[in-house]
Amino acid sequence: INNNFYPEFDGITLRKNLAVFYNNKYNMNFDEENFIIGYGASGLLSLIGEVFLCCGDELVTSQLTFESYEISAKRNGAHYVEVPTKENLQINLDGILDAITKKTKMIIICNPNNPTGMILKEEEIKNFIMKVPENVIIVVDEAYFEFIDIPNYKSMMQMIGNYPNVIVIRTFSKVYGLAGARVGYAIMNKEISVNLIKGVEFASSLSALEGAIAALNDVEFIKKTKEVIKEGREYLSKEFKKLGFKVFPTQTNFIYVDTKLDTKFIAEKLKEKGILIRGDLLLSRITVGTMKQNKRLVSAIKDIISNEVL
């Protein structure tokens, strides 16, 4: 890679590769104009917000979901509307439909959801999309889609042809292991991409774009990664249940856990043992690591619980 040159500002080569990849995988009819490359999924969320949201608009989404949605809304002066989840923490699609008003410009559905890891039934999302007014942009965040372990479960890319208000977001940060490269992409109707592409200055760095192209077709790496994550997910779920924790069903590379303990205290003790957990999510959302890392985490938690009064 000759980094003496600037990258393609719109990532056209990667976009062409993505079109071929999904046409072959899902029997779609995409071309490069159906794709936009961005600085990670978060960068794309910012871009989409800048184009479609303004002061007084509403962005409707679920409670207990990815924090960047709220940032995107408030950055553009839009009102952020959170719809409570169902009792089992699943996204309440009917509730989101009920929350739509004349001011609603955008809806975001994270599937699988972050931080819960839970997934919606394919038919539920399809029916939901059909009921949303056509003037409302529907963003389906599928950042963790590749981890789904359900045979024949289809992406909402399938809806783009008939529903031009649908945008699907994907990323190379998760299953492809390129979080530091910051390469995300959005799939959409060409009518929408024409407006979004105007906001792209440089999609990403030259090295990141080339790395994404190489990773896209690395079938063996993806297969191995999914196997490692599935094994680690099952191990952590089993061990946490033994400790009396409530473990929510997940289709991602992390698990959502209700410990019913003083999570801030445990996080501090884990930090003393060289194990860091993000912010105030603490023991709620735990990313699956290597088996060595997973066992070290479980051992540390057991040690803390047995030696401290919580």
PLM regions with names:
Residues 51-109:
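PLP-dependent aminotransferase-like
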Residues 74, 91-102, 115-138, 142-173:
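Active-site pre-lysine segment of PLP-dependent enzymes
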Residues 234, 239-273, 288:
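Conserved PLP-binding catalytic core of the aspartate aminotransferase-like
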